[in-house]
């Protein structure tokens, strides 16, 4: 998603710096829009215009490019057969997350979803994970969080959750943090977890 924001801003001659990239890590889409609108008042439409443009890109991305990670369907099938509760805790807007899951016939695997709209705070704080565990009736130690954002892996681990880090090129700079905070790591495919859970 960082690349989407960078690509959108580039069309206005704005090149996102490493400092700006780090500052926005863990922000919701509205927070990112406000951050860049404040820094670049010349952006057409301010924060609402940026939100609208980014929203179009995100919608297109979910509809045409985003796909499930290799092996995830078989993995989810296995968890469901074992009666393991599953939920989603995401900073993605609910409408985008639900549409992506529905379009890929994946909604039925999950008991519920919590989003940034439900908790109002980034994954630098453990609220979204703690509320998800509470809603499932489980202690953090009895849950496993699957995350690709290194800072979010660290947050979940510090809150007492078991963590499975998912290596993603977009977070290459933080891969050592992801590995340090993770009990398990998915390099490329969920098939790698066979016999580990």
Predicted regions and their residues:
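N-terminal start-of-chain detector that recognizes signal peptides
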Residues: 5-6, 57-60, 85-87, 116-118, ...
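N-terminal helical cap/lid subdomain that shapes the substrate entry/recognition surface
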Residues: 1-73, 77-82, 95
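Hydrophobic beta-strand core positions in alpha/beta domains
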Residues: 87-88, 165
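Asp-based, Mg2+/Mn2+-dependent phosphohydrolase catalytic module
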Residues: 77-80, 93-197
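Generic anion/oxyanion-binding catalytic loop in active/binding sites
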Residues: 10, 21-22, 61-64, 86, ...
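Residue-level detector of anion-binding/catalytic polar loops
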Residues: 15, 85, 162
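Residues at secondary-structure transition points
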Residues: 23-27, 45, 49, 63-70, ...
